[in-house]
Amino acid sequence: MFIDLTDGQAALRDELREYFGGLLTPQEREVLVTDRQGPVYREVVRRIGRAGWLGVGWPTEYGGRGLGQMEQQIFVNEAARADVPLPGVTLQTVGPALQAHGTSEQKDFFLPRILAGEVHFAIGYTEPEAGTDLASLRTRAVLAEGGGTYLVNGEKIFTTGAHAADYIWLACRTDPGAPKHKGISILIVDTSDPGFSWTPIITHDGAHHVNATYYTDVRVPVTMRVGPENAGWRLVTTQLNHERVMLGPAGRIAALYERVLGWAASQAGPGGRPLLAQPDVQRALGRACASLHVNELLNWQVAATDTVDVADASVTKVYSAEQTQHLGQLLEEVVARHGDPADEETGQLCRWLDIQAKRNTVLTFGGGVNEIQRELIATAGLGLPRVPR
């Protein structure tokens, strides 16, 4: 069996490839190498929104083009291939969750602004004492006198993009007496509230992506609760499944493969022979090409279904995260063996590969560490018994 895109999907891919290839100025691209949350990023997202691309797969009733999840995945892959950052959490996880569980007022307010690139969310889940065991979270939300507003107190950690977000999609405990999976609610927190604050966590790429966030009597209207009170765990798991798929676009591997392939094609190897004739270069690029196509199939498998399967989401995340890291190292070694860093083209490629390697470290634990993903694959996908705790 040969599986491929339809003619219409292939045409969309080619159109998006051309669009993303010409989207950024050289100055914008240089800024976005390290600053993927700031003003340049937000302007780029607004530009994509004005072009009508952000909602390519969203239903028309919510302002999208209505083409479907496969087309939305093509959009995400092509952005990753061109190394153009997207508001993945906002567009790929919060947006679909609001479509499924939001009130009419929430949909009317947030969804058009998301598609315009005007509103950005961060996810407030992990806490210092609740990482892998997320259901142990302690951040509290208590109804204030009168019952129309929650007062939120607590802290979160590793909140990516919180310093630049307009809202936090916050998991908090609204019933401390309930079993730990039962007393959780999802609130949308406005980051302009005076009780909200953050401190930066600088990651090893030297950039500021991640934060610790603090909530001190933060006021959240009850109208900003998503879904019923104490029924937030299902929203958490649904959002995480979407996030795991978001973390695994084949475009990341495509970017690594095509960039090094293009470099190798322009280089001479020993004795003046083409560098692409070297066996180690062929092996590395062949492996990258094969992994790229496997990743594409996993993306398409998830996109072809109406709902995101737990095991399929975890498989996609584990495979893509680990292959992206492994292939990044493999291709770096090829460039290190055969390239001259003093050469301008080679030096730029070395810098880009180093930044990718550091940036992609998060992939194996963002959205849930891969060790836990393997447990989910075993239990939800293969029907094996749960690991005793």
Predicted regions and their residues:
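Amphipathic, small/basic residue-rich leader segments at the start of a protein or domain
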Residues: 1-88, 109, 113, 261, ...
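Glycine-rich phosphate/cofactor-binding loops in nucleotide/flavin-utilizing enzymes
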Residues: 2, 74-75, 93, 233-242, ...
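Glycine-rich beta->alpha junctions and the first turn(s) of the following alpha-helix
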Residues: 2-7, 196-295, 363
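C-terminal helix-coil-helix/basic helical segment that borders enzyme active sites and/or dimer interfaces
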Residues: 28-35, 269-276, 293-348
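Internal helix-loop-helix
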Residues: 49-108, 112-117, 161-167, 292, ...
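A short, Trp-centered hydrophobic/proline-enriched beta-strand micro-motif
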Residues: 117-126
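A structural signal for short hydrophobic beta-strand segments in well-ordered beta-sheet cores
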Residues: 139-143
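A short core secondary-structure module
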Residues: 148-199
